[in-house]
């Protein structure tokens, strides 16, 4: 029997957004729950990247993150999903570390995320999802994205 998830964390980079929304709503089965969508601005850049270039990259990624979070909210809420409470969170840092931190801070019941694997690495999980699987304090629902 599937647990009654009341607080769900959905980290996204914008890829596979429709699949993440679909799986999240399937887990809810129309029940009341809070969905926290997380976008992490990955601030890791090569060592010799000029400061101005890094600042520009972070600004662009932040703008993209805001757009993605708005799209996620549209897909998860509305008249067809009246029991879903939505909250958007944006962080900067290492994506896997931030996902685990938010899961701990928010005491979430489950994380719904894509595998992140590519056709080249189809025998492995994506590095972010692999790290989250090992360190997350809760159940992980991985959505196959390839």
Swiss-Prot record:
This is Universal stress protein MTH_1154. InterPro entries: Rossmann-like_a/b/a_fold, Universal_stress_UspA, UspA. Belongs to the universal stress protein A family. It comes from the Archaea. It holds the Pfam family Usp.
């Amino acid at each position: 029997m599937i647990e009654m998830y009341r607080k769900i964390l959905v980290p996204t980079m914008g890829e596979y957004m429709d699949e993440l929304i679909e799986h999240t709503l399937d887990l809810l089965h129309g029940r009341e729950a809070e969905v926290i969508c997380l976008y992490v601005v990955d601030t890791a850049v090569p060592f010799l990247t000029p400061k101005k270039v890094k600042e520009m990259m972070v600004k662009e990624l932040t703008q993209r993150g805001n757009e993605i979070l708005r799209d996620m909210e549209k897909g998860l809420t509305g008249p067809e999903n009246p029991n879903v409470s939505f909250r958007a969170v944006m962080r900067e840092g290492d994506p896997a570390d931030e996902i685990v931190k938010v899961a701990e801070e928010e005491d979430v019941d489950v994380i719904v995320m894509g595998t992140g694997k590519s056709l080249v690495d189809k025998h492995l999980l994506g590095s972010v999802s692999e790290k989250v699987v090992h360190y997350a304090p809760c159940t992980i629902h991985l959505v196959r994205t390839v």
